Amino acid sequence: MSEIKDVIVQGLWKNNSALVQLLGMCPLLAVTSTATNALGLGLATTLVLTLTNLTISTLRRWTPTEIRIPIYVMIIASVVSAVQMLINAYAFGLYQSLGIFIPLIVTNCIVVGRAEAFAAKKGPALSALDGFAIGMGATGAMFVLGAMREIIGNGTLFDGADALLGNWAKVLRVEIFHTDSPFLLAMLPPGAFIGLGLMLAGKYLIDEKMKKRRAKTVVNEIPAGETGKV
């Protein structure tokens, strides 16, 4: 149970692929102009990570070490192709918005990295959980960045959600404030860099506060007579 909890915590926060490892920067910065696009690509990446980790872990004993990387890429490419066809069939609007960034998941360092660092060494169930946790951590970071840029740039949230979830999702659109002209800095790549920098700073501050809180807890748990001992 502790190993499962550690995998989840590492994937979602401590070893977050976007905010700690800084992997997958190309789609993170390019696609997160809206919360819907960010959520769509994040969920697609999560599905790819989960399925590829599961497949690679299952086949790890029969995978020759010398050619493991090409085999990993073939497996990842097959899964990405299947996910791309699913998005094309059931969320065509999102498919058009994401464009080339769906097939580019094949070359995403997050996917290849987890295959090599985790799935090739652990069992299928734990590897699938790792892929899911890492994917959801990346999705969360992408969603927060996309929501921030969409709100500042257009004054809306979940604009175009029907492209991802269907016609019923039009009711999810929220107009936070009205603007006749979008704030282009937030919508363009420089805004993505600024937003990511703010998120990195925010995570650092949260981690520092958590460290101080844990240190205080440890000090309070030490008996008064032992605090002066070396």
UniProtKB/Swiss-Prot annotation:
The record lists the organism as Escherichia fergusonii (strain ATCC 35469 / DSM 13698 / CCUG 18766 / IAM 14443 / JCM 21226 / LMG 7866 / NBRC 102419 / NCTC 12128 / CDC 0568-73)
Q: Which residues cross the membrane?
A: 18-38, 39-59, 63-83, 86-106, 128-148, 182-202
Q: Note the SS bond partners.
A: none
**What GO cellular component entries does it have?**
plasma membrane
Q: How does it assemble?
A: The complex is composed of six subunits: RsxA, RsxB, RsxC, RsxD, RsxE and RsxG.
Q: What is this protein called?
A: Ion-translocating oxidoreductase complex subunit E
Q: What does this protein do?
A: Part of a membrane-bound complex that couples electron transfer with translocation of ions across the membrane. Required to maintain the reduced state of SoxR.
Q: Name any Gene Ontology BP term.
A: electron transport chain
EC number(s): the record gives 7.-.-.-
Q: Which domain of life is it from?
A: Bacteria
Which Pfam families does its entry note? Rnf-Nqr (PF02508)
Q: Which UniProt keywords apply?
A: Cell inner membrane, Cell membrane, Electron transport, Membrane, Translocase, Transmembrane, Transmembrane helix, Transport
EC main group: translocase
Q: Does the keyword Cell membrane apply?
A: yes
Family membership, please give it. Answer: Belongs to the NqrDE/RnfAE family.
The answer to whether the entry has keyword Thylakoid is no
The way it spans or sits in the membrane comes to: Multi-pass membrane protein
Localisation per UniProt entry: Cell inner membrane
